């Protein structure tokens, strides 16, 4: 069987949900008073959208093969990402065999080094890479997890990220991760409110249910260390992404100074094997949390995971729905997965990228069997309006 080549690449954009999960209507828990790097400014504390967290929107990448098969993927990137894909990256994709994923990744990455390396450029590369994996798996009529070597577990189990871990427990999740609401600029009163909220949630879920805090790059080392010590008495399992992503030295110190038994996690906003090599070699964390739609795609996540596995560090990918599920199902050092509660009040399970994807699986009772449908097993919803802002 001769492998088809790629004849077209298209970059589309979507507003309102999808992969840019911050792009939500008013009243959604994810846009509440949540600590961010911008919380130092009072005018940007009450709503994360106030400082533009949702300006990018969703980027949809389609790659079409010469036999008519279409692979696609979604990530965050919007019009900026679409420009990068259409005007720069497409030249490295069109005309290539669908099997040449490694070559295409290498060319995309090295061609963008002078303005890329991380951020929206890596989002764009990640989206193209995921679309290529979807395409190859569809051409071969196999699920992506089969291309990765096959599943090592029959089903995944999940913790839930959202405002209501108490409800997540009732739904069967193994743990709940709360957003931290107040940062250092809100002083002692803010710290006490953070701890009171954690204590209240602990009283609701009992002693054995995992509780974690998502700090979203909003803290400094002294505040994070104090928070960790005071939260330890409340049974906090881990403290996540406390510091700016580039503060490897701060993470290393924090990990040394937190209470014995508490885990330090990070990596959601890190990218490439080199970024994660820094986290691992400097012993910055106990768990890395790459986002497959931001870190370099599945091709790069495979490398990142191997680095972590060699050091005995767990890989629990950030969100990303099916793009993470297929990977987690194939790796022993990814024993569970994250599920983002995207219902506005975090009170029910809805597909993470709703309404953009059809057939997107969701956990039932906190568990899920990864589908065996070819590719990533999802379809684009034809009722969702998409734009193609650039062509090449």
From Swiss-Prot:
InterPro entries: Enolase-like_C_sf, Enolase-like_N, Enolase_C-like, L-Rhamnon_dehydrat, Mandel_Rmase/mucon_lact_enz_CS, Mandelate_racemase_C, Mandelate_racemase_N_dom, RHMD-like. GO terms for biological process: amino acid catabolic process; carbohydrate catabolic process. Substrate binds at residues 22, 48, 338. Binds 1 Mg(2+) ion per subunit. Transmembrane segments: none annotated. The record marks 338 as: Transition state stabilizer. GO terms for molecular function: L-rhamnonate dehydratase activity; magnesium ion binding. SMART domains: MR_MLE. Its cofactor is Mg(2+). Keywords: Lyase, Magnesium, Metal-binding. PROSITE patterns: MR_MLE_1. It is an enzyme of class 4 (lyase). It catalyses: L-rhamnonate = 2-dehydro-3-deoxy-L-rhamnonate + H2O. The active site is at residue 318. Gene3D superfamilies: Enolase-like C-terminal domain (3.20.20.120), Enolase-like, N-terminal domain (3.30.390.10). Pfam families: MR_MLE_C, MR_MLE_N. The record marks 291 as: Increases basicity of active site His. Mg(2+) binds at residues 214, 240, 268. Its EC number is 4.2.1.90. Signal peptide: none annotated. Reaction proceeds via a syn dehydration. Catalyzes the dehydration of L-rhamnonate to 2-keto-3-deoxy-L-rhamnonate (KDR). Belongs to the mandelate racemase/muconate lactonizing enzyme family. RhamD subfamily. Homooctamer; tetramer of dimers. HAMAP family: Rhamnon_dehydrat. This is L-rhamnonate dehydratase. The gene is rhmD.
């Amino acid at each position: 069987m001769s492998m088809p080549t790629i004849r077209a690449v298209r970059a589309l954009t979507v507003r309102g949900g999808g992969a840019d999960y911050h792009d939500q209507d008013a009243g959604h828990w994810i846009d509440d008073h949540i600590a961010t790097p911008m919380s130092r400014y009072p005018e940007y504390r009450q709503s994360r959208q106030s400082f533009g967290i949702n300006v990018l929107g969703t980027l949809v990448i389609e790659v079409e093969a010469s036999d008519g098969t279409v692979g696609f993927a979604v990530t965050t990137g919007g019009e900026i990402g679409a420009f990068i894909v259409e005007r720069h990256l497409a030249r490295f994709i069109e005309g290539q065999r669908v099997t040449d994923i490694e070559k295409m990744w290498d060319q995309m990455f090295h061609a963008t080094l002078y303005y890329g390396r991380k951020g929206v450029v890596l989002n764009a590369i990640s989206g193209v890479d995921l679309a290529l994996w979807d395409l190859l798996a569809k051409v071969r009529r196999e699920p992506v997890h089969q291309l990765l070597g096959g599943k090592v577990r029959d089903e995944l189990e999940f913790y839930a990220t959202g405002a209501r871990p108490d409800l997540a427990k009732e739904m069967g999740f193994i743990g709940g991760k709360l957003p931290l609401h107040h940062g250092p600029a809100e002083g002692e009163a803010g710290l006490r409110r953070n701890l009171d909220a954690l204590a209240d949630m602990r009283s609701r879920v009992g002693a054995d249910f995992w509780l974690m805090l998502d700090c979203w790059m909003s803290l400094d080392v002294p505040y994070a260390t104090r928070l960790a010590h005071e939260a330890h008495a409340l049974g906090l399992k881990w403290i996540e992404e406390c510091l700016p992503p580039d503060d490897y030295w701060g993470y290393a110190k924090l990990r040394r100074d937190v209470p014995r038994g508490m885990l330090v996690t990070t990596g959601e906003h890190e990218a490439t094997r080199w970024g994660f090599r820094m986290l691992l070699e400097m012993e910055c964390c106990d768990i890395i949390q790459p986002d497959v739609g931001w870190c370099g795609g599945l091709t790069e996540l495979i490398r990142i995971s191997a680095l972590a596995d060699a050091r005995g560090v767990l890989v629990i990918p950030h969100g990303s729905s099916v793009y993470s599920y297929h990977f987690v199902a194939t790796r022993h050092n990814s024993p569970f997965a994250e599920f983002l509660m995207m219902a506005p009040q975090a009170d029910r399970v809805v597909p993470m990228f709703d309404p953009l994807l059809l057939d997107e699986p969701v956990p039932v009772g906190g568990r899920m069997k990864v589908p065996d449908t070819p590719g990533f097993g999802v379809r684009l919803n034809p009722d969702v309006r998409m734009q193609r802002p650039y062509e090449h």
